Amino acid sequence: MRQTNDHLTIQPKILYYGTPVVLISTENEDGTSNLAPMSSAWALGQVVVLGLGAEGQTAHNLRERPDLVINLPTAEQWPAVERLAPLTGRDPVPDHKRGAFRYEPAKFAAAGLRPEPAELVRAQRVAECPLQLEARAVRITPDLHDDFLIVEAHVLRVHADPAVVVPGTQHVDPTAWCPLIYNFRHYFGLGPQLGQSFRSETPVVGVAGN
């Protein structure tokens, strides 16, 4: 570690610098459901880009069956996410996961979550998640070292709890919706609102100077 000006040059083992957590549900070969947490997810238009391990059950399922649901938990639901964290749907457990992960076929039950049918895809939704995005993987690309997959998923339908929707609109209320953030392997919610983008179509609530 060395210092340059006012910054230190460091080599962190991970770069999870604060991104939303999602729960990805996919369909197994036998028609049952797999559910996996991940924090490498971002949206561009109606496409959500996902990064996931190449040897996991989610990757295996999406290669064969492209349907999925991107379920977004709230900050308060982090214990359910953590219950899923040490589980894998792969049997046998992949070599790189042995010792830290265990095989669990009933992921919904293990997390204390309830499945509910989707409308346009075969994968199931997580009933407790306020936002549920039915989607289909349209492109799957390996990374440079074949350790991960980059999945481009086209969102087909969005389900939202009325509590996080601006009444009478198609907008998610940013003052009501509090995503779960994965910050260097710690779980966080959002702090108070600081401001808004010039492109926002929802009103500012309780921000000083506005």
Regions found by a protein language model. Give the residues of each.
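Basic, polyanion-binding surface patches
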Residues: 1-210
